[in-house]
């Protein structure tokens, strides 16, 4: 996938990067650095009236030139937390998220739904109204739904999953399920782009990191390359140390 000179007015200055199928790309940066703007621009939810320029190429398909309904064949996008717009049960919400126009055998559909529901641990909530869910439960339903849209066995054309701060409403245990879900989607061959404030998660989980500051691309590459002490101190304006605990690298902000 190629992102070429994507920009949004003065909120996001032109930037370009490439990523390969199956890569997990994490977008990091301070509040107001342009993370959500970048993700919504890639997802095609911003219009040219909002100053969006550039292109998103997926296997030579120019994503942003397609109508939103056609874009949804190739990519799924989870914006930041929102409440349910209408009252349905969880299983109905998931059914609404299944790809349309695909002739997939019912056992395959059931297997995909069962796997996603297991990954987000919502087996006992399928017949509960979405209006009765807690914030963390609703976020897990949203995650399951957006993944079903681009689940490879249901939608062989899917290429990209975009998640904007998906861990924000989740507790520690629920966040663990989220990262397992991200791994599952990447293993299916999708590019997964995630905005995340938890820099230790970014450092430990990302294949590539895109570091933004005030709408400008500061660095892009492997986690070790991008999340250097020098880069992090420059962008976040706070002292940083790297330590290892039981062989696992961690960042400490002092």
UniProtKB/Swiss-Prot annotation:
<comment type="subunit">
    <text>The complex is composed of two ATP-binding proteins (BtuD), two transmembrane proteins (BtuC) and a solute-binding protein (BtuF).</text>
</comment>
<dbReference type="GO" id="GO:0005886">
    <property type="term" value="C:plasma membrane"/>
</dbReference>
<dbReference type="InterPro" id="IPR003593">
    <property type="entry name" value="AAA+_ATPase"/>
</dbReference>
<dbReference type="InterPro" id="IPR023693">
    <property type="entry name" value="ABC_transptr_BtuD"/>
</dbReference>
<dbReference type="GO" id="GO:0016887">
    <property type="term" value="F:ATP hydrolysis activity"/>
</dbReference>
<keyword id="KW-0547">Nucleotide-binding</keyword>
<dbReference type="GO" id="GO:0015420">
    <property type="term" value="F:ABC-type vitamin B12 transporter activity"/>
</dbReference>
<feature type="binding site">
    <location>
        <begin position="29"/>
        <end position="36"/>
    </location>
    <ligand>
        <name>ATP</name>
    </ligand>
</feature>
<keyword id="KW-0997">Cell inner membrane</keyword>
<dbReference type="InterPro" id="IPR050153">
    <property type="entry name" value="Metal_Ion_Import_ABC"/>
</dbReference>
<dbReference type="InterPro" id="IPR027417">
    <property type="entry name" value="P-loop_NTPase"/>
</dbReference>
<feature type="domain" description="ABC transporter">
    <location>
        <begin position="3"/>
        <end position="239"/>
    </location>
</feature>
<keyword id="KW-0813">Transport</keyword>
<keyword id="KW-0067">ATP-binding</keyword>
<comment type="function">
    <text>Part of the ABC transporter complex BtuCDF involved in vitamin B12 import. Responsible for energy coupling to the transport system.</text>
</comment>
<dbReference type="GO" id="GO:0005524">
    <property type="term" value="F:ATP binding"/>
</dbReference>
<keyword id="KW-1003">Cell membrane</keyword>
<dbReference type="Pfam" id="PF00005">
    <property type="entry name" value="ABC_tran"/>
</dbReference>
<comment type="similarity">
    <text>Belongs to the ABC transporter superfamily. Vitamin B12 importer (TC 3.A.1.13.1) family.</text>
</comment>
<dbReference type="InterPro" id="IPR003439">
    <property type="entry name" value="ABC_transporter-like_ATP-bd"/>
</dbReference>
<keyword id="KW-0472">Membrane</keyword>
<keyword id="KW-1278">Translocase</keyword>
<protein>
    <recommendedName>
        <fullName>Vitamin B12 import ATP-binding protein BtuD</fullName>
        <ecNumber>7.6.2.8</ecNumber>
    </recommendedName>
</protein>
């Amino acid at each position: 996938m190629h992102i070429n000179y994507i920009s949004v007015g003065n909120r996001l200055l032109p930037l370009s990067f490439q990523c390969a199928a199956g890569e997990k790309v994490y977008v990091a940066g301070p509040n107001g650095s342009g993370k959500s703007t970048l993700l919504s621009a890639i997802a095609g939810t911003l219009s040219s009236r909002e100053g969006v320029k550039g292109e998103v190429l997926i296997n030579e398909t120019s994503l942003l030139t397609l109508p939103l309904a056609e874009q949804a064949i190739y990519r799924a996008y989870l914006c930041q937390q929102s409440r349910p717009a209408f009252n349905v049960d969880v299983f109905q919400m998931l059914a609404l998220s299944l790809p349309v126009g695909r002739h997939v055998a019912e056992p395959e559909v059931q297997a995909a739904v069962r796997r996603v529901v297991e990954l987000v641990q919502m087996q006992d909530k399928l017949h509960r109204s979405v209006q009765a869910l807690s914030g963390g439960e609703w976020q897990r339903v949203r995650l399951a739904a957006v993944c079903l849209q681009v689940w490879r066995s249901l939608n062989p054309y899917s290429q990209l999953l975009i998640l904007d701060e998906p861990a924000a409403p989740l507790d520690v245990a629920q966040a663990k399920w989220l990262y397992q879900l991200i791994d599952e989607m990447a293993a299916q061959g999708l590019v997964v782009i995630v905005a995340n404030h938890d820099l230790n998660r970014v450092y430990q989980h990302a294949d590539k990191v895109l570091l933004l500051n005030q709408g400008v691309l500061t660095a892009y590459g492997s986690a070790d390359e991008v999340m250097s002490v020098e880069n992090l101190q420059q962008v976040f304006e706070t002292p940083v140390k790297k330590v290892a605990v039981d062989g696992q690298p961690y960042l400490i902000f002092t």
